[in-house]
Amino acid sequence: MANQKKKEMVHDFQQKFTDKMKSLGLHFKNIDLYQQAFSHSSFINDFNMNRLEHNERLEFLGDAVLELTVSRYLFDRHPHLPEGNLTKMRATIVCEPSLVIFANKIKLNELILLGKGEEKTGGRTRPSLISDAFEAFVGALYLDQGLDTVWTFAEKVIFPYVEDDELVGVVDFKTQFQEYVHSQNKGDVTYQLIKEEGPAHHRLFTSEVILENKAVAEGKGKTKKESEQKAAEQAYKLMKNKKSL
């Protein structure tokens, strides 16, 4: 019964994925690689698959590929901007809210393979899950087709938003807080994961932001990255409210 359900889900994914790539004008060779890119850990757990078959390794790779691609784009587009400005712009483009915008533009969340529990609790519309799948897809595209194809994809899905300044409202609180700290000569900012709880398909992470060896705020999120953003947001708001850090 379980194997039949898995086969049906995989078959449905392969059909949808093939149609999606065709609509994007992209070619692919290894569909198994892309299946992994869209396999959430809850899907892997539901069908007792190898834990390394979920998309987190590809997410790790895709994150780096995105940073490189966006860095090259900004480097070429803004030849007179200093490194600090380019870094800030890149952070806005590759932060979670922006990745969700890109993913939703092409409805990538429709492709994500989820476990039953994650599906029921709204995982398909969860921002952290969508952004992770987007990064994993980029990682898979890089391995399967190379950096030139990733660039082509970015030209269609990412760069138009940047050129139209449609990401102005997206806030990367880690960058905001870092810039404030730097302007005040307050020392180094680090983040530390202090708690991880809940079942594998519905994890909750708690991180704290540390300034000059002192924890100044905490944040919770469905991923470590999200919890760090929430912690930075709290710290930044404390600063805006003129409370001592």
UniProtKB/Swiss-Prot annotation:
Pfam families: dsrm, Ribonucleas_3_3
Function: Digests double-stranded RNA. Involved in the processing of primary rRNA transcript to yield the immediate precursors to the large and small rRNAs (23S and 16S). Processes some mRNAs, and tRNAs when they are encoded in the rRNA operon. Processes pre-crRNA and tracrRNA of type II CRISPR loci if present in the organism.
Positions annotated as active site in the UniProt record: 63, 135
InterPro entries named in the record: dsRBD_dom, RNase_III, RNase_III_dom, RNase_III_sf
One annotated Gene Ontology cellular component of this protein: cytoplasm
Biological process, per Gene Ontology: mRNA processing; regulation of gene expression; rRNA processing; tRNA processing
The family this protein is said to belong to: Belongs to the ribonuclease III family.
Positions of the DRBM domain: 172-241
Domain RNase III as annotated: residue spans: 17-146
Top-level EC class as recorded in UniProt: hydrolase
Complex and partners: Homodimer.
Swiss-Prot/TrEMBL keywords: Cytoplasm, Endonuclease, Hydrolase, Magnesium, Metal-binding, mRNA processing, Nuclease, RNA-binding, rRNA processing, rRNA-binding, tRNA processing
Protein name per Swiss-Prot or TrEMBL: Ribonuclease 3
This enzyme's EC code(s): 3.1.26.3
Gene Ontology MF term list: double-stranded RNA binding; metal ion binding; ribonuclease III activity; rRNA binding
Residues holding Mg(2+): 59, 132, 135
Gene: rnc
Compartment(s) where it occurs, according to its Swiss-Prot or TrEMBL record: Cytoplasm
Catalytic activity: Endonucleolytic cleavage to 5'-phosphomonoester
Co-factor(s): Mg(2+)
